[in-house]
Amino acid sequence: MEPQAEERTLGEPAPPPSGALASPTPDEEERTEGGAPPTATPAGASGDSTSADGLWGLPVEHAERRPECGRCSRPQKVCLCPYLPVRPLQISTHLYIIQHPAEESRVLRTVPLLAACLPPDRCTVKIGRRFSEERDVELATVCRDSGTLILYPGAEATNLEEFILDSPVYPSTIILIDGTWSQAKDIFYKNSLFRLPKQVQLKTSVCSQYVIRMQPTNRCLSTLECAAVALSILEKNNCIQETLLRPLQALCSFQLQHGAQIRLSKEYLLRNGLYPKPMPKNKRKLRKMELLMNSVKI
C-alpha cells in the first residue's frame, strides 16, 4: 500500500521536486551565470590528466532564483500586484483550499493569486493527499459543520445556486481541491472526510480564461476561476468574480507576451483531429477519450 503523504499548510517548506528542471520561461529560475557547465574529457583523451570521475568532487554553483514579490509570489519583473485589489476583499465565506503537493512546485499556479486577494482569516490552504480526523482535527471539524460545502462536480452534486435557495442553513465555508483533474479525483474519493460536506458544483457555460494550461474540456475552470464564481454566488456580489479574475488575465497576458502558447482543451483537439499523441490502448482511457470527443461530461 502506498505510504500516506503528510499534509502541510501553505508557507511550510516543501521537499525539493524530483526530476530534471523544465525549460526556462519568464517564470522559472534564471540560468547560472558564466554559461554552460564544463564538460568532462572523454576517457582515453590526451592532454588532461584529470579523470572524468574527478569532476564529481568539484563545487557546483547553484542557479539563483529571481527575487519574488512577497504578496503575489511572482518574480519581481512580472509582479502582478498592480492587478490585485488594493485591500483584501471583505467576504464572510471561509475558503479552504486542499492542494495536491505537486501543485506547490508549479510555476503557473493560481492559488497564490487567490490567497493574495482575500483576507488571511478567510482563505486557508492545506497541502497533502491524505487527510484524516486524527491527523487534522481542524479540517475534520470544518467538514462536519452543516454550513460547509465541497465544490466537486459529479452525479451526486447539486448546483450551487439551487442549493443556497433551498438550504435552511446558509453556507459559511466552501472547500475546493487544487490539482490536475486526476489528482483532484484521487483526493476526493480517497479521503472519507470530504464525503461529509454537501457536494455542490457550478452551473456555468463560461470558458476558462486560464489559456496557458491545458484543460480536459472547454468547460473546465482553474481553481481561482472556480473560487471566483462560487464566492460571487455565496456573497451575492458579481464584482468579486471580476476582481479575482483580473490577476489571472494579467498572468496569462504576460506569459503570452513572453512566448507562451494558447493551450487548447483536450476535448477541442480530439474533436478536430489535432491531438498530437496516439490514442491509448487501455479500454478505460480510450472510453474517456471517446466521451471527450462527443462532449459528454465525465
Swiss-Prot record:
Region (Disordered): 1-55
Gene Ontology cellular component list: cytoplasm; nucleus
Sites of Phosphoserine modification: 132
Keyword hit for Phosphoprotein: yes
Protein purpose: Catalyzes the formation of 3-(3-amino-3-carboxypropyl)uridine (acp3U) at position 20a in the D-loop of several cytoplasmic tRNAs (acp3U(20a)). Also has a weak activity to form acp3U at position 20 in the D-loop of tRNAs (acp3U(20)). Involved in glycoRNA biosynthesis by mediating formation of acp3U, which acts as an attachment site for N-glycans on tRNAs. GlycoRNAs consist of RNAs modified with secretory N-glycans that are presented on the cell surface.
PANTHER family cross-referenced by the UniProt entry: TRNA-URIDINE AMINOCARBOXYPROPYLTRANSFERASE 2
Designated name of the protein: tRNA-uridine aminocarboxypropyltransferase 2
